[in-house]
């Protein structure tokens, strides 16, 4: 059910569209790598609806935060967690009151090999693989969730020598896709449209909630395109795209 906040956002989008292309502007958006494909779709729909252009950059949430702290001119931040947007707000990098959850992420243990990954993750306790890929837990929330999952399953110490670490969840998926690792913990959004292979959607209770938050950054506080993009992200069209990629929406 669409919340009142999202209904209000939908109305704002209609008003922005009515303003026409004369008000068209551009905004720089830092996007957590797990959200690459939905962000591309949302940006295209946003341009059609408002005339504004959202220029997207993709990477790990931790890397983006470090760049922003050193003056990178991003105007909107779509993080893979809630901690960094909260920190941005506390440190004066983000506009107070603009932070909200845009998606709840899901973690998947994935392999290109059919039958390798079972429906309970028991493969992690077996000797049937040489490498498992995870994103850097210090920089990528999906990596932290992977670490928590292995610890909860009691397999982390045995699996640790087999771990290969990606700088972002995008690189982690590449490790699996190219065969550098037989299996890896990736975002559901990365494999939801991939046929074949084998996968286990990790129960949400096995790790901390992947609460993905967005925030308006100070370089964008007076940019109508930045504000419009966040309003659009809350609206029904973006919500439908987000759900299509396997995310949950509050």
Q: Could you tell me what each predicted segment is?
A:
Residues 9-20:
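Bacterial N-terminal signal peptides
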Residues 1-11:
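Bacterial N-terminal signal peptides that target proteins for export
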Residues 24-58, 62-72, 79-82, 86-92, ...:
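Exported/periplasmic ABC-transporter solute-binding proteins
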Residues 3-5, 19, 83:
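Short, intrinsically disordered low-complexity segments
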């Amino acid at each position: 059910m669409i919340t009142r906040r999202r209904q209000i956002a939908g109305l704002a989008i209609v008003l922005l569209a009515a303003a026409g292309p004369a008000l068209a502007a551009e905004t720089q958006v830092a996007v957590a790598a797990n959200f690459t494909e939905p962000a591309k779709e949302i940006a295209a729909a946003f341009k059609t609806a408002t005339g504004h252009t959202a220029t997207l950059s993709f990477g790990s949430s931790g890397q983006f935060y470090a760049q922003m702290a050193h003056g990178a001119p991003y105007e909107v931040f779509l993080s893979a967690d809630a901690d960094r947007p909260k920190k941005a707000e506390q440190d004066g990098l983000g506009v107070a009151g603009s932070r909200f959850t845009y998606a709840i992420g899901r973690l998947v243990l994935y392999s290109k090999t059919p039958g390798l990954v079972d429906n309970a993750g028991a493969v992690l306790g077996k000797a049937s693989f040489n490498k498992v890929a995870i994103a850097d837990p210090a920089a990528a929330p999906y990596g932290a969730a992977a670490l928590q999952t292995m610890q909860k399953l009691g397999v982390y110490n045995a699996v640790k020598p087999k771990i290969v670490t990606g700088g972002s969840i995008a690189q982690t998926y590449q490790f699996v896709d190219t065969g550098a690792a037989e299996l890896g913990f990736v975002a559901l959004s990365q494999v939801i449209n991939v046929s074949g292979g084998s996968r286990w959607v990790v129960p949400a209770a096995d790790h901390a909630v992947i609460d993905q938050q967005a925030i308006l950054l100070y370089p964008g506080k007076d940019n109508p395109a930045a504000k419009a993009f966040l309003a659009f992200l809350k609206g029904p069209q973006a919500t439908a795209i987000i759900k299509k990629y396997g995310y949950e929406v509050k």
